[in-house]
Amino acid sequence: MTKTMSNKESLEKLIFALDMGGGLDDVMSWVRRLAGHVGVFKVGKEAFTRFGPQLVQSIQETGSRVFLDLKFHDIPNTVARAAEGAVELGVAMFNVHALGGMSMMTETVESVKKMAGRRELPMPLILGVTVLTSLNDEDLQRLGFTCTTGELVLRLARMAQDAGLSGVVASAQDVEAIRAACGKDFVIVTPGIRGLARVAGDDQKRVLTAEEAVRRGSDYLVIGRPIRTAEDPVAAADDFCREIARGLSAR
């Protein structure tokens, strides 16, 4: 795909999820294969537990950016110290569970600012996880919540913004409400993105296509299986970039 300015912008919004089996060499083969076709590589619990900081550093050595998707959720001091470690790793973005509360989020923001300033490192985006895309209203009721997923997402997004976070991770179905409540500068990262055909074994319930998610206001899209299981993963990534570009044009 020719990298015009609009395509470059769409590429930077595409996050590839490195959620797969195999060894470090297998994971890095995906990074090398897709570098230049996606903007960010997401390192989640599966990959980080197996390979640790070495994986983050190996990705960065290719010139690519990293989204550290560990969803920190603990007492404020513990999360703040973990966040400082994320700054030292030089990741472009990382996340915390907004359900960890206001104190946890505000202390994390302050610690990250201090660490980045002290080490003269770039300030990463700090994202609040709202409601996992695998959960629906029935799931929340079983957990004891009396609100809908949309209501809880909006409440947590506002709390994250008040705490000073850069943005949130939220389903595309919640993007418009978040954008209206939190404004145009609040970053929204959207998982649960699928192609026109759903992936076999899909366990995410609140999903949309890339074009529709961007049209609604998503800033970054997390895509894994639809690229990884495609016959031609590079072509699939390029197709998603084109979808993103169409969504941007339709805003």
From Swiss-Prot:
* Keyword field: Decarboxylase, Lyase, Pyrimidine biosynthesis
Q: Quote the record's binding site residues for substrate.
A: 19, 42, 69-78, 133, 194, 204, 224-225
Q: Which reaction does it catalyse?
A: orotidine 5'-phosphate + H(+) = UMP + CO2
List the EC numbers from the record.
4.1.1.23
Q: Where is the active site?
A: K71 (proton donor)
Gene Ontology CC terms, in alphabetical order = cytosol
Pathway(s): Pyrimidine metabolism; UMP biosynthesis via de novo pathway; UMP from orotate: step 2/2
Checking SUPFAM superfamilies in the record gives: Ribulose-phoshate binding barrel
One GO term in the molecular function aspect is:
orotidine-5'-phosphate decarboxylase activity
Q: Which InterPro entries match?
A: Aldolase_TIM, OMPdecase, OMPdecase_AS, OMPdecase_bac, OMPdeCOase_dom, RibuloseP-bd_barrel
**UniProt xrefs under PROSITE patterns:** OMPDECASE (PS00156)
Q: Which CDD domains match?
A: OMP_decarboxylase_like (cd04725)
Q: Top enzyme class of this protein?
A: lyase
* Domain of life where this protein originates: Bacteria
Which Pfam family would be a valid example here?
OMPdecase
What's a single GO BP term from this record?
'de novo' UMP biosynthetic process
Name the job this protein performs.
Catalyzes the decarboxylation of orotidine 5'-monophosphate (OMP) to uridine 5'-monophosphate (UMP).
Q: Which family does the similarity line name?
A: Belongs to the OMP decarboxylase family. Type 1 subfamily.
Q: How does it assemble?
A: Homodimer.
Which NCBIfam families does its entry note? PRK00230.1, pyrF
User: Could you tell me what this protein is called?
Assistant: Orotidine 5'-phosphate decarboxylase
